[in-house]
Amino acid sequence: MFKSGSGSLKRSGSISSVKSFSGDSEKGLPPISRGSVSIASQNSEPLIVPASSSSFAATSDFVPEKTKSEGNLKNKSSVITGNFGSSGPTNAHYNQNANGDRLAENLLLKESSKGRGSSTPDARHTATDSRLSQEVKQPFSEENASGNDLNTGRGSHGTGDGVEQYYKFDCEEGMSAYHKRVVDTFFKYFEYPAEDGHSTLYSDVMFLSGGGDLGLLVMSRYQEVMTLRLRSAIYGIFCYLQALTAYLTYFSAKVGQAVMLDEELEKYEIRLDVAQDDDPIVFQITTGVFTSGVAHDLRKLTQILETFSLER
């Protein structure tokens, strides 16, 4: 269980429209739709890298929303925004075997073809790219072939130890084989030694959740993986964004923000605001202290966000 950091998942009202993400003949995922992601800085300075290194636009017209006074909040903030709304009706006959594999493959190939910022791909990365691109092509088992209803009727799981037990044993059942493969593939893809000799400290995050269907989507089965595989605080963001963007399309995610809380400590807060009808949901994560490699790590983050948005 996580021991440091903080995070929260809040929701008002209820969400009753989510039934399954398994894509069987009666219940299914909506089609993946295209979106856009941009990076802006209040003080007109690009948050990450020159335009030549990324297709993200650096702008200065962002007016940060009012925030609570917490920590050492500076007068500088940056924001990452994206429109991940679904562009079409739900496809009740979504073909995971074909479309799911193709999406995962495209994400991997696009990311590997773009390179890794200022770093140079080595033999280990090349071998990893090849191995993983083959891995996502492997045939799916018959697991979840009949679909999984997220409304399992297992009752309230509350908070504290009950949450940990619930997520560890039940959430895996609410995920399709396709979702497991895509997330696992990205975990493996980013599992490589930190570059430039910077520290690989990862700040754990404690989730406070009201439970229900949304809880399944956020935590899934990767609680223990996050502390074992992710090599730095920024990779924690990779984990949450990858898992969430795969599911938040269903809820028509409107905006994601990365707000600098402390300039000297390079402390950020990541928020994803989602709206399903009139039922707003806020996912908030405080990463803690970044290391001296924050510029390199944030450059990686832009590449991943770009990949997600372009494939929607």
Curated annotation (Swiss-Prot):
GO cellular component: host cell cytoplasm
Bias (Polar residues): 74-97, 135-154
Name of the protein in question: Non-structural protein 12A
Keyword set includes Manganese: no
Stated role: Constituent of viral factories.
Subcellular location: Host cytoplasm
Biased composition (Low complexity): 1-23
Alphabetic keyword roster: Host cytoplasm
Main location: host cell
Domain of life: Viruses
Protein's UniProt keywords contain Nucleus: no
Family from the record: Belongs to the phytoreovirus non-structural protein Pns12A family.
Biased composition (Basic and acidic residues): 63-73, 122-134
Region of interest (Disordered), residue spans: 1-37, 62-97, 112-159
